[in-house]
């Protein structure tokens, strides 16, 4: 049997930054009472798909969030066997170091969160390019991300439209370049006007999972047709009868996998661990610190 190994084009390594808003305010257009659970599950599937990329392509995944329930779920994901499961030669420390959660210190919406995350990523890993990725891509496949990042590596800044052609699912900046995120209505055109090279025509329909973000029930149906990840499948199987996220989406939870204050269970197969953050303090930006 012949095994094909993809190597990053031009030797470019990436830090992928994903913003995740408070779960109680997430996916308000998704007309389901369990939308908070689904928002978290889709984010976890997105993160796991990115982490399945080769380490020389994606050096780290940085999630920017202030949501405690998401924080807990991501921290338990940190030490799960899913991180780097297809790369058994990686040490546990090397696997967990790829997943970084930082607080959304601006706390002023999606774009300030991305600016904050990109700045910390560039300070910690100045030789890496930065990619801002939507956190609602439950059908994302690692080869799709590899293909998109390989194309993006040829440009100082690049953008990929969502399935509708008007929004943005991926915005990239080479090492030393400014990301300039402007996510929101008609963001694809806005990013193009700011100088980002459009990858949509080049990639076309070859990356359907990457372009299928989920905001509505119709979007969710299309993602399910493409094939969603294990966390989203579990959330959909649990259905409307699962506990919903409480108003404050608080609580760090315990090893049971449930956030005590929120009542939102971590999707099955994810075990307890520790959380790693990058914090800005007197020692300068980008210092790694562990939290119990």
UniProtKB/Swiss-Prot annotation:
Example GO biological process: F420-0 metabolic process
Keywords from the UniProt entry: GTP-binding, Nucleotide-binding, Nucleotidyltransferase, Transferase
Signal peptide positions (record): none
The keyword Nucleotidyltransferase is assigned to this record: yes
Catalytic activity entry: phosphoenolpyruvate + GTP + H(+) = enolpyruvoyl-2-diphospho-5'-guanosine + diphosphate
GTP-binding as UniProt keyword: yes
MF GO annotations: GTP binding; phospholactate guanylyltransferase activity
Pathway: Cofactor biosynthesis; coenzyme F420 biosynthesis
Residues reported to bind phosphoenolpyruvate: 168, 184, 187
Annotated EC: 2.7.7.105
Region Disordered, residue ranges: 243-292
Function recorded in the entry: Guanylyltransferase that catalyzes the activation of phosphoenolpyruvate (PEP) as enolpyruvoyl-2-diphospho-5'-guanosine, via the condensation of PEP with GTP. It is involved in the biosynthesis of coenzyme F420, a hydride carrier cofactor.
Similarity field: Belongs to the CofC family.
NCBIfam families found in the cross-reference section: F420_cofC
Name of the molecule in the record: Phosphoenolpyruvate guanylyltransferase
Source organism phylogeny: Bacteria, Bacillati, Actinomycetota, Actinomycetes, Frankiales
């Amino acid at each position: 049997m012949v095994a094909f190994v993809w190597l990053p084009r031009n030797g470019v390594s990436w830090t992928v930054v994903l913003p995740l808003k408070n779960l109680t305010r997430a996916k308000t257009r998704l007309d389901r009472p369990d939308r908070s659970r689904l928002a978290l599950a889709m984010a976890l599937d997105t993160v796991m798909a990115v982490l399945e990329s080769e380490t020389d392509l994606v050096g780290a995944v940085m999630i920017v969030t202030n949501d405690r329930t998401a924080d807990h779920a991501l921290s338990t994901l940190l030490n799960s066997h899913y991180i780097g499961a297809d790369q058994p030669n990686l040490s546990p420390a090397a696997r967990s170091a790829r997943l970084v959660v930082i607080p959304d210190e601006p706390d002023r919406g999606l774009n300030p969160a991305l600016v904050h995350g990109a700045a910390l990523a560039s300070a910690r890993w100045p030789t890496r390019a930065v990619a801002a990725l939507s956190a609602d891509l439950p059908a994302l496949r690692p080869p799709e991300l590899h293909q998109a990042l390989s194309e993006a590596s040829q440009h100082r800044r690049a953008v990929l439209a969502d399935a509708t052609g008007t929004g943005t699912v991926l915005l990239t900046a080479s090492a030393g370049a400014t990301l300039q995120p402007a996510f929101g209505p008609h963001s694809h055109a806005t990013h193009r006007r700011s100088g980002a090279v459009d990858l949509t025509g080049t990639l076309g329909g070859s990356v359907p999972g990457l372009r299928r973000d989920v905001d509505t029930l119709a979007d969710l149906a299309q993602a399910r047709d493409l094939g969603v990840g294990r966390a989203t499948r579990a959330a959909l199987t649990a259905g409307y009868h699962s506990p919903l996220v409480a108003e404050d989406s608080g609580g760090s939870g315990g090893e049971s996998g449930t956030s005590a204050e929120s009542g939102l269970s971590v999707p099955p197969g994810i075990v307890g661990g520790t959380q790693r953050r990058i914090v800005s303090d007197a020692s300068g930006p980008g210092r790694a610190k562990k939290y119990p």
